[in-house]
Curated annotation (Swiss-Prot):
Its cofactor is pyridoxal 5'-phosphate. It comes from the Bacteria. This is Glycine dehydrogenase (decarboxylating). One of its GO terms (biological process) is glycine decarboxylation via glycine cleavage system. It comes from Escherichia coli O139:H28 (strain E24377A / ETEC). The lineage of its organism: Bacteria, Pseudomonadati, Pseudomonadota, Gammaproteobacteria, Enterobacterales. Pfam families: GcvP2_C, GDC-P. It catalyses: N(6)-[(R)-lipoyl]-L-lysyl-[glycine-cleavage complex H protein] + glycine + H(+) = N(6)-[(R)-S(8)-aminomethyldihydrolipoyl]-L-lysyl-[glycine-cleavage complex H protein] + CO2. The gene is gcvP. Belongs to the GcvP family. GO terms for molecular function: glycine binding; glycine dehydrogenase (decarboxylating) activity; pyridoxal phosphate binding.
Length: 957
């Protein structure tokens, strides 16, 4: 045997698991594109002046088992205290049936945002259920399909209040003093760039302040008080002030709906519905508003529509509000939200139903009543007479109480003057309450749970009678049927089967990087050591998290060529916003706050101008030349015209046209020459890692889509993570946090997310990916992603022209197929091709972005040659079908493309088409068939007849 022991140990085994084509397949594809090796291909495509001479030093690869063992040892450093800190985060009991069949199921977590509704009906139904939960609990008319977290939802509510306000000259936003501090932090950050003045005061003093356009109230208050805001809201409404309420989703099960009290906007975190705290996230926020404000709402909204056969079908509604269409005029820069987490919360509500939720909420409240009664019986004073689950307890010996709590491995809220906060949750037991008595009163308190229970059961006054809900919730059949595990398992499976995810087929979406989310990467997110930590626990209890985050940040620094990384932004859009704020504050620190012009190429993703607008900048568009590259002449002219007002440029690399622009360094130099900063959008980082880096190119700041390049799954539309890398001069200006000091960051800036490290519990996914790939594997992943894209481009270019290419006719990691000539010749559009691909078992590529009338294809490195060939064969077969239309064999108004997709029912229905059933549903010999459950959606009907809540079950049958 000639192999060494090191070779037999094969520490790089995961690289071969992650990268789809094996060595032989890679060579076949290299031969097809006319390159000798991966290095030779990279050398041809990537400009030589930006190629790294040595790979980033992120270590050697590790096997899946070694990496898991290493991360487990790190996770074990976290201390799992019982946390009663509250402040919007509580422990939960995630039903195992949802854990196993959704959170651990690639059929749910590897799907993409449901832009293609025909292959997304399952998660769209779950999201519609989430919206129904929101509507029932808030008492309002219109709900979104989730936002990023409660604090960012508050910032969105403020912005929305200003948009809809009739008080056009008012510029002040009032925040009640008992709003969660992290929420206030994020609101202040957003208000600064919008030029709003934030006033913080007791809610009852709001009428003392003038020029207020909006008010934010908290129900229940951060220290536990239940407020009856009915009269106050009525008075505010009479003065045309827009009222927003941040609400506790579990408390709303028992309390009067804020919408019934007159609130215009209600939002909050859905974390309590089954989603672990995870050191801060990810969690879905719910958001609801009055019907009259629906077109000003942020985020995705799922609506009920019809398909081509007239059957009920679901889709994302009113997309004209969103950043990918309205750009800087969009309601928000929100792109990805928190679909996977919203669906967990949705199914939690389905599984428990109204009876189960009331039982949970009443149990939490009863235990809180028992705790309150015992403490008061022993002479302790409560700050609030009315509460749901949180007590604010005045204590004389606060230091002693906190010391006893620490000894008992209990976290209490400690930032309240002369008091401690205690928030109970669905995991709290009578034994926990007895332990709390001992912490607060000493071991010899003599209290008994059953005795106290009898007292409070007959005489509980902790919720005002006027604040008790008097209407029924969750009356729709979906919330009253699936309560056995068998029924729930089958319901979830029925939803999963309606969708197309990576566990069934390649998802070739350009600019989305739908790569493998490996099982080994996903395993740690359910470890209790990561899942159960409160984001505001003492730092010494989170040493495992701190070590993992620091190590991941160090790797990202080396991979990006930056000097520091901030982990707080919990989406790519938030990363853009945070990066632009860093630039803004940097200019202000140099007395150049007047620099507010952001240059953005015409090809940019819609989030870029939307984020620039949110950061208080003016957008100036830079033209692209005929080859799709930034027009340097126009760039120089625009930069010179901006002069001392130039803030930055936002540029994507490789470009959104799928090309490594040769002049990228010159672009950076021009902007720097005029005093601007370079924001390099990290959306296409998968074509940079190990080959080049933003810092080496000359950029100053980038966000990194960990849910693209670094393997966090898309979750059907979230979660995402968008940490930012910065050069040293921008490091003092990254987001900070008002509750937790972020170690290693000397920033005094406000927060952009509720938690200091954003969605911390999914960071282990990226840690595992980098650890298992090592420097060698990461570079190879980028190279194979480039190879796969060029292989597709070379094989399809005769049938579908590749719109933009770089040097030697090559593309980067994605390519744009130009459908416009075919449409002119035949009338068949990119939409028809996208829908026909469903019949072949594929999710469509990205449609009409960045160029209308095109399809953008990104295969990633994870797809094998077999799958690439299957996609190519499907596209070529579709081209042959188009030729049939062109030749007149099939009429333009009745052919397999315009009628696509085809569903099972059509196999047994009357058939009057000029093509066969076999051509319709088994084209080109498709064997492993994916069946969509609806035909093509009627988008116009959906927006004209907007309906965003659950429809009768019969509509789905």
């Amino acid at each position: 045997m000639t192999q060494t022991l090191s070779q037999l140990e094969n520490s790089g085994a995961f690289i071969e698991r992650h990268i789809g084509p094996d060595a032989a397949q890679q060579q076949e594809m290299l031969n097809a594109v006319g390159a000798q090796s991966l290095n030779a291909l990279t050398g041809q495509i990537v400009p030589k002046d930006i190629q790294l001479a040595t790979p980033p030093q992120v270590g050697a690869p590790a096997t899946e088992y070694a990496a898991l063992a290493e991360l487990k040892a790190i996770a074990s450093r976290n201390k799992r205290f019982t946390s009663y800190i509250g402040m919007g985060y509580t422990a939960v009991q995630l039903p195992p049936v949802i854990l196993r069949n959704m959170l651990e199921n690639p059929g749910w977590y590897t799907a993409y945002t449901p832009y293609q509704p025909e292959v997304s009906q399952g998660r769209l139904e779950a999201l519609l259920n989430f919206q129904q939960v929101t509507l029932d609990l808030t008492g309002l008319d219109m709900a979104s399909a989730s936002l990023l977290d409660e604090a960012t939802a508050a910032a969105e509510a403020m912005a929305m209040a200003k948009r809809v306000s009739k008080l056009k000259n008012a510029n002040r936003f009032f925040v009640a003093s008992d709003v969660h501090p992290q929420t206030l932090d994020v609101v202040r950050t957003r208000a600064e760039t919008f030029g709003f003045e934030v006033i913080v005061d007791d809610a009852q003093k709001v009428l003392d302040h003038q020029d207020v356009f909006g008010v934010l109230l908290q129900q229940v208050g951060t220290t536990g008080e239940i407020h009856d805001y009915t009269a106050l809201i009525s008075e505010l409404k009479s003065r045309k002030i827009v009222v927003s309420v941040a609400a506790d989703i579990m408390a709303l099960v028992l309390l009067t709906a804020p919408g019934k009290q007159g609130a215009d906007i209600v939002f909050g975190s859905a974390q309590r519905f089954g989603v672990p705290m995870g050191y801060g996230g990810p969690h879905a926020a719910f958001f609801a508003a009055k019907d009259e404000y629906k077109r000003s709402m942020p985020g995705r909204i799922i609506g009920v529509s019809k398909d081509a056969a007239g059957n009920t079908a679901l889709r994302m509604a009113m997309q004209t509000r969103e950043q990918h269409i309205r750009r800087e005029k969009a309601n928000s820069n929100i792109c990805t939200s928190q679909v996977l987490l919203a669906n967990i919360a949705s199914l939690y509500a389905v599984y428990h139903g109204p009876v189960g939720l009331k039982r949970i909420a009443n149990r939490i409240h009863r235990l809180t009543d028992i705790l309150a009664a015992g403490l008061q019986q022993k002479g302790l004073k409560l700050r609030h007479a009315h509460y749901f689950d949180t007590l604010c307890v005045e204590v004389a010996d606060k230091a002693g109480v906190l010391a006893r709590a620490e000894a008992a491995e209990i976290n209490l809220r400690s930032d309240i003057l002369n008091a401690v906060g205690i928030t109970l949750d669905e995991t709290t037991t009578r034994e926990n309450v007895m332990q709390l008595f001992s912490v607060l009163l000493g071991d010899n308190h003599g209290l008994e749970i059953d005795t106290l229970d009898k007292d409070v059961a007959h005489d509980s006054r902790s919720i005002q009678p006027a604040m008790l809900r008097d209407d029924e919730i969750l009356t729709h059949p979906v919330f009253n049927r699936y309560h056995s595990e068998t029924e729930m398992m089958r319901y979830m499976h029925s939803l999963e089967r309606k969708d197309l995810a990576l566990n069934q087929a390649m998802i070739p979406l350009g600019s989305c990087t739908m790569k493998l989310n490996a099982a080994a990467e996903m395993i740690p997110i359910t470890w209790q050591e990561f899942a159960e930590l409160h984001p505001f626990c003492p730092p010494e209890q989170a040493e495992g998290y701190q070590q993992m985050i620091a190590q991941l940040a160090d790797w990202l620094v080396k991979l990006t060529g930056y000097d520091a990384v901030c982990m707080q932004p919990n989406s790519g859009a938030q990363g853009e916003y945070a990066g632009l704020l860093a630039i803004r504050h940097y200019h202000e620190s140099r007395n150049e706050g007047h620099r507010d012009i952001c240059l953005i190429p015409a090809s940019a993703h819609g989030t870029n101008p939307a984020s620039a607008h949110m950061a208080g900048m003016q957008v100036v568009v830079v033209a692209c030349d005929k080859n799709g590259n930034i027009d340097l002449t126009d760039l120089r002219a625009k930069a010179e015209q901006a002069g001392d007002n130039l803030s930055c440029i936002m540029v994507t690399y490789p470009s959104t046209h799928g090309v490594y622009e040769e002049t990228i360094r010159e672009v950076c130099e021009v902007v720097h020459q005029f005093g601007g900063q370079v924001y390099l959008d990290g959306a296409n980082m998968n074509a940079q890692v190990g080959i080049t880096s933003p810092g080496f190119i000359g950029a100053d700041v980038s966000h990194l889509n960990l849910h693209k390049t670094f393997c966090i799954p898309h979750g059907g539309g979230g979660p995402g993570m968008g940490p930012i890398g910065v050069k040293a001069h921008l490091a003092p200006f990254v987001p900070g946090h008002s509750v937790v000091q972020i170690e290693g960051m000397l920033t005094r800036q406000g927060a952009v997310s509720a938690a200091p490290f954003g969605s911390a519990s999914i960071l282990p996914i990226s840690w595992m990916y980098i650890r298992m790939m090592g420097a060698e594997g990461l570079k190879k992943a980028s190279q194979v992603a480039i190879l796969n894209a060029n292989y597709i481009a070379s094989r399809l270019q005769d049938a579908f022209p590749v719109l933009y290419t770089g040097r030697d006719g090559r593309v980067a990691h994605e390519c744009i197929l130009d459908i416009r000539p075919l449409k002119e010749e035949t009338g068949i559009s990119e939409l028809d091709i996208a829908k026909r691909l469903i019949d072949y078992g594929f999710h469509a590529p990205t449609m009409s972005f960045p160029v209308a009338g095109t399809l953008m294809v990104e295969p990633t490195e994870s797809e094998s040659k077999v799958e690439l060939d299957r996609f190519i064969d499907a596209m070529l077969a579709i081209r042959a079908e188009i030729d049939q239309v062109k030749a007149g064999v099939w009429p333009l108004e009745d052919n397999p493309l315009v009628n696509a997709p085809h569903i099972q029912n059509e196999l047994v229905a009357e058939w009057a088409h000029p093509y066969s059933r076999e051509v319709a549903v088994f084209p080109a010999g498709v064997a492993d068939k994916y069946w969509p459950t609806v035909k093509r959606l009627d988008d116009v009907y959906g927006d004209r007849n907007l309906f965003c809540s659950c429809v009768p079950i019969s509509e789905y049958q």
